Amino acid sequence: MNNIWWQTKGQGNVHLVLLHGWGLNAEVWRCIDEELSSHFTLHLVDLPGFGRSRGFGALSLADMAEAVLRQAPDKAIWLGWSLGGLVASQIALTHPERVQALVTVASSPCFSARDEWPGIKPDVLAGFQQQLSDDFQRTVERFLALQTMGTETARQDARALKKTVLALPMPEVDVLNGGLEILKTVDLRLPLQNVSMPFLRLYGYLDGLVPRKVVPMLDKLWPHSESYIFAKAAHAPFISHPVEFHHLLVALKQRV
């Protein structure tokens, strides 16, 4: 069986599982893991095929969620950033008894633009898939630059993301393509109407991948959830605004 890379740290009485985004790995959380591990028992995970979780091919969202769940604590707050938000959401839908609270960060239940739904144009995602075969590293770097564009700390935030990618071997092209396929095709807008655990959605006002227009739309669709927008953040608010991010999670802990 292929193994998911998993690291546990901290002594908190609540478990917090952190799931990273497309093309990256768990090293992306190093900017906040020390602070969080003083409040939570923290679980850092490389998604299947990414980082140190080698030996996986492209997986569907459901298979990715099941692979991650195999090593997870019985009950935890599940936090997913970007693509990781879809994985955390899938776990909340299929195994709600394992999820104390769901937190999505700069994530959308439907990343791809649809009729009357803002998102990434499908041809942009298809273009990334094509370019992966042509110039793998440059395509990943372009995607990372998109994630920090517009913020006051854009350059240093992009450097932090690039350092995370380069710290470990690059994922296989089919794994990256599989991740883009999930972003292109998955739509969890209606299923997530039915989750009953605390549900916190965090966004960056300047995010170029998850338009802020989706926030009021999802407030209406999911009235049981809460949303918060980081006024000066883009797609990686935990890198640009770590203190604010940390406070929101500690406040959530008091409620679960």
UniProtKB/Swiss-Prot annotation:
Catalytic reactions on record: 6-carboxyhexanoyl-[ACP] methyl ester + H2O = 6-carboxyhexanoyl-[ACP] + methanol + H(+)
InterPro entries (alphabetical): AB_hydrolase_1 (IPR000073), AB_hydrolase_fold (IPR029058), BioH (IPR010076), Carboxylesterase_BioH (IPR050228)
Signal peptide residue numbers: none
Keywords attached to this entry: Biotin biosynthesis, Cytoplasm, Hydrolase, Serine esterase
SUPFAM superfamilies: alpha/beta-Hydrolases
Active site per UniProt: S82, D207, H235
Record flagged with keyword Hydrolase: yes
One Pfam family from the record: Abhydrolase_1
One cellular component (GO) term of this entry: cytoplasm
Positions contributing to substrate binding: W22, S82, L83, F143, L144, A145, L146, Q147, H235
Record GO biological process: biotin biosynthetic process
Pathway(s) the chain acts in: Cofactor biosynthesis; biotin biosynthesis
EC number assigned by the record: 3.1.1.85
Domain AB hydrolase-1: residue ranges: 15-242
Superkingdom: Bacteria
Compartments (UniProt record): Cytoplasm
Enzyme class: hydrolase
A molecular-function term among this protein's GO annotations: pimelyl-[acyl-carrier protein] methyl ester esterase activity
Entry function: The physiological role of BioH is to remove the methyl group introduced by BioC when the pimeloyl moiety is complete. It allows to synthesize pimeloyl-ACP via the fatty acid synthetic pathway through the hydrolysis of the ester bonds of pimeloyl-ACP esters.
Family the UniProt entry places it in: Belongs to the AB hydrolase superfamily. Carboxylesterase BioH family.
Assembly and oligomerization: Monomer.
Protein name as it appears in the record: Pimeloyl-[acyl-carrier protein] methyl ester esterase
Organism of derivation: Escherichia coli O1:K1 / APEC
Gene name for this UniProt entry: bioH
